[in-house]
Amino acid sequence: MKASMFLALAGLVLLFVVDYASESEEKEFPIELLSKIFAVDVFKGEERGCKGFDDSCTPGKNECCPNHACSNKHKWCKVYLGK
């Protein structure tokens, strides 16, 4: 009787330890994933010859990227919809 109680208690302790370990791994997973994503150098700004959306521009000059146009009113590049 004592041996079976001891085995049951040891099994419960083992179950709690495994559950705690899996929960801590689940909590660390999003942090590891984000650190791997943002460690890539893809997010560094690249210099380009044209100005993209919401960049300041001078109306009349062709400074904006293709499919963008310089707004006369706001003086920034906006998406050109063909109007």
From Swiss-Prot:
Any one GO MF annotation of this record: toxin activity
Recorded superkingdom: Eukaryota
InterPro entries associated with the record: Huwentoxin-1 (IPR011696), Huwentoxin_CS1 (IPR013140)
Disulfide bonds listed in the record: 50-65, 57-70, 64-77
Tissue/organ expression: Expressed by the venom gland.
Record's GO cellular component terms: extracellular region; host cell presynaptic membrane
Pro-peptide positions on chain: 22-48
Compartments reported by the entry: Secreted
Pfam families registered for this protein in UniProt: Toxin_12
Record's keyword terms, sorted: Amidation, Disulfide bond, Ion channel impairing toxin, Knottin, Neurotoxin, Presynaptic neurotoxin, Secreted, Signal, Toxin, Voltage-gated sodium channel impairing toxin
PROSITE patterns for this protein: HWTX_1
Family: Belongs to the neurotoxin 10 (Hwtx-1) family. 15 (Hntx-3) subfamily.
Domain notes: The presence of a 'disulfide through disulfide knot' structurally defines this protein as a knottin.
Subunit comment: Monomer.
Name recorded for this polypeptide: Mu-theraphotoxin-Hhn2k
Upper classification of the organism: Eukaryota, Metazoa, Ecdysozoa, Arthropoda, Chelicerata
